[in-house]
Amino acid sequence: MKLTCVMIVAVLFLTAWTFVTADDSRYGLKDLFPKERHEMKNPEASKLNQREACYNAGSFCGIHPGLCCSEFCILWCITFVDSG
């Protein structure tokens, strides 16, 4: 019985917290979709396609391949050179 009451209170608290912390809960999706459609028409407008800075070969990248210009990372950025 106590566990059920605790679970109900937790669900109500998390639901209220979601609504309180939302930026604009009424019109959030209305403004979101036109931006996505605009980015689909112009892929260069997407922020995901822009790389501000990337690491050259031999630079330490840890386990994050997105940091390397070549997209290959095994602790250090790696580039593969074609010989032919």
From Swiss-Prot:
GO terms for molecular function: sodium channel inhibitor activity; toxin activity. It is found in: Secreted. GO terms for cellular component: extracellular region; host cell presynaptic membrane. The keyword Transmembrane does not apply. Keywords: Amidation, Disulfide bond, Hydroxylation, Ion channel impairing toxin, Knottin, Neurotoxin, Presynaptic neurotoxin, Secreted, Signal, Toxin, Voltage-gated sodium channel impairing toxin. The modification 4-hydroxyproline is found at residue 65. Disulfide bonds join 54-69, 61-73, 68-77. Expressed by the venom duct. Transmembrane segments: none annotated. Residues 23-51 form a propeptide. The modification Serine amide is found at residue 83. Residues 1-22 form the signal peptide. Belongs to the conotoxin O1 superfamily. The presence of a 'disulfide through disulfide knot' structurally defines this protein as a knottin. The cysteine framework is VI/VII (C-C-CC-C-C). Delta-conotoxins bind to site 6 of voltage-gated sodium channels (Nav) and inhibit the inactivation process. This is Delta-conotoxin-like MVIB. It comes from Conus magus. The lineage of its organism: Eukaryota, Metazoa, Spiralia, Lophotrochozoa, Mollusca.
